[in-house]
Amino acid sequence: MMKFLTYIHVYLIQAILNFLPFCWIDVFYDNQTYIGNQLHHPIYLFLWAFSSAIGFYYYSKKIWEKYNVNYIKKNHALICLGMILSCSIPYNDITLLKDLHVWLSILFVAWFILEWFLYIPVHLNKNSILFFINIGLSFVFTFMFGHITGFCEIYFSFTTNILLHHWMFQD
C-alpha cells in the first residue's frame, strides 16, 4: 500500500503541483513565492513546499536505511521542515525581512544537497551519478536565468523526487 501511495505522490500529486505554475506565471522569470504572495495562492505554495519536502524527507530516509547509511535523523527532519517554513514566510516591506524567505530557502536546500554530498560517496553508483547531474543542471538553470525562477524550483523539486523515488525501489 505504501509503495502505491509513493507512486501517487510522485507521479500524480507532484506532477499536478509542478504543472500549475506554467498556467499562472512566466516560470522563466517569476518564482513559486510570487504565486503564493502576489497572486494570493498561499495554500498552493504550502502544498507544493510540503509535498516536495515530504518526498525529500521520506525517500532520502528510506534510501539511507536501505544502504545502512548512518545519517543524523534530527538534522534531516529539520532541513525538510525548514524548506516548508521558508515557503510559508510572506513578503515583507521591512528591508531586513524582505528576502528572508529566499535566504532560508537557499540555506535549507543547500543543506539538503550538502547532506547528500556527505552520504553519497558511501555508495557511489549510477543513481548517485544521476543525482549529481540533477543538482548540476539545477545550478546551470539558475545561472542561465540569472536568478532562482519557478522553472528552477519546479525542476529541482520534481526531478529530485523522481530520482529519489526510483532509487528507493531499485534493488
Go through the PLM ranges and name each one:
Residues 4-11, 67-79, 123-133:
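Membrane-interfacial loop-to-transmembrane alpha-helix junctions, especially the N-terminal start
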Residues 76-131:
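Membrane-proximal helix-loop-helix units in multi-pass membrane proteins
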Residues 34-44, 91-105, 144-154:
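Membrane-helix interface and helix-disruption motif detector
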Residues 62-64, 87-96, 120, 140-148:
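Juxtamembrane "helix-exit" motif on the non-cytosolic side of transmembrane helices
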Residues 123-171:
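Terminal transmembrane helical module of multi-pass membrane proteins
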Residues 70-78, 82-84, 88-91, 145-151, ...:
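Membrane-proximal intracellular helices of multi-pass ion channels
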